[in-house]
Structure formats: C-alpha cells, structure tokens
C-alpha cells in the first residue's frame, strides 16, 4: 500500500508487559478517508494497539507516523493536537456537565485561546457554533441542556463520538462504539458512522463481524498481538486461517 500519501503509518510497533507481547511487530497503513476495521478475539491486543497509537501507552519498538511526521515519542495530547482522536470502550464524559458544556469543553481543548472563569466558553461564538453543529449532526440537540449522566446509554455513546470529532481529526480511532447498545441504538450508531466526514481515516474495533465487514473496506485481524492477515474485506473473509482462528473457533 502506498505510504507517501498515508495519514497514519505503523512500522514494527510493539508493546510488551513483562513477558507478554500484547502488541507484536504490527504494521498498518491508513490512507485519508480509509474505513478500516481491527478485529480479533478478546485479548488479541486491539485496545492496547489503540492506546499505543493515541499515545496513552508508549511503544517499546517501532515507529508511528502521522501525516508524514514521526509522533512515536509524543504524548497523547500532542498527538491529539496533530490530528488523532479516539473513543474508549468505557464512555468517558463529564457526567455533571450538560451535553452542550461537554461539547464546548471538547471544542476548546484544541483551541489556542485561553479561557478563564471571567471568560466562559459560552462567550465564544465560534466555539458555540462548532459545538451546536456537532450536536445537530449527531442528533443530540434536543438534549443540549440535559446533564450527560441523564442521557440514555446509546446517546452517551453518540455524544462520545461527537466529542471525538470536536478537534476536526485526521484519524479517528473508535473502540467498540456499539458495545452494549440495543439493536435500535446500534442501527442508529451505524447510520451516524456512515455519515462521518469522508476525508477522515477511521479505524474501528468491533466484535460484531457483520458490523465490522459492513463498515470497513479493509480489515486487519489481530491475534495474540500479531497481525494474522490484512486486506480487502472480501479477501480476509475468505482467508482460511482467519476462519479457523477467529471467525470460527475463537469468535466471541
């Protein structure tokens, strides 16, 4: 795959915990606008890989390149400023702030201006406009003045994805955004994900094979920290090693 135009490139990325090779020599390339799924059984290293990409964990080996720049040693907030955003398996919101306030905080986080008690976020029209537009996009406007903790779980998951879009990311990491959702909520989330900006590269962790293969154009299968196979979804689904090690015996 061509790397000169790639927005994210992992080369030989590893992360070990003592003798456990949680992520082992992983190579991955995302082009702008990619829709890519990362699948594998529990314990395969998927979330650990996300943590390494986003800077929550440091790589023990290998390099991570974002938009042509080496970000391997940068902290998470520095990578976020350069265009990486993510969601988590467990929703991370400010439960005692309103939906709009959550959105404003996310929009301000990557803004260069400094805000104080004497200059509240709501006093900045462009931030309010950005926050309001995102709430509209994710169909959360009716709840803008409600506390985040009062939202249904499905709407909390939607809010987290909306928050991840606040900084206009180039690469978006979605860690099981449909986990724990009802069938109706899953359908709504899938519809929203299909409408994400087509210029953003999206890497999705998803246990539901139908969802993963329905969303992504390319699939990477991770098994025991290593890439078992990677390629177009039609090729991966027909791969016998994938059928035996994941889609068959080890699917959970």
Segments predicted by a language model, with ranges:
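Glycine-rich phosphate-binding loops of nucleotide-dependent enzymes
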Residues: 2-252
């Amino acid at each position: 795959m061509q790397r000169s135009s790639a927005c994210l490139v992992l080369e030989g990325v590893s992360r070990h915990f003592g003798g456990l090779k949680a992520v082992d020599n992983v190579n991955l390339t995302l082009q702008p606008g990619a829709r890519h799924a990362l699948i594998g059984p529990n314990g395969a290293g998927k979330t650990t890989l996300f943590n390494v990409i986003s800077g929550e964990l440091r790589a023990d080996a290998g390099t991570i390149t974002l938009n042509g720049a080496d970000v391997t040693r940068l902290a998470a907030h520095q990578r976020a400023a350069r265009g990486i955003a993510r969601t988590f398996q467990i929703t991370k919101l400010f439960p005692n702030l309103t939906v709009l306030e959550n959105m404003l905080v996310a929009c301000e986080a990557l803004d260069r201006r400094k805000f104080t008690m004497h200059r509240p976020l709501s006093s900045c029209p462009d931030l309010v406009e950005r926050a309001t537009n995102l709430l509209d996009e994710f169909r959360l406007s009716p709840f803008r003045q409600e506390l985040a903790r009062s939202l249904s779980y499905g709407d909390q998951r939607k809010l987290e994805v909306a928050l991840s879009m606040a900084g206009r990311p180039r690469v978006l990491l979605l860690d099981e955004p449909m986990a724990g959702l009802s069938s109706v909520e899953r359908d709504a989330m899938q519809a929203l994900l299909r409408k994400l900006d087509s210029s953003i590269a999206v890497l999705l962790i998803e246990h539901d094979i139908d969802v993963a293969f329905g969303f992504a154009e390319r699939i990477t299968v991770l098994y025991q920290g290593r890439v078992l196979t990677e390629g177009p979804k039609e090729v991966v689904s027909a791969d016998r090693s994938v059928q035996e090690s994941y889609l068959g015996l080890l699917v959970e």
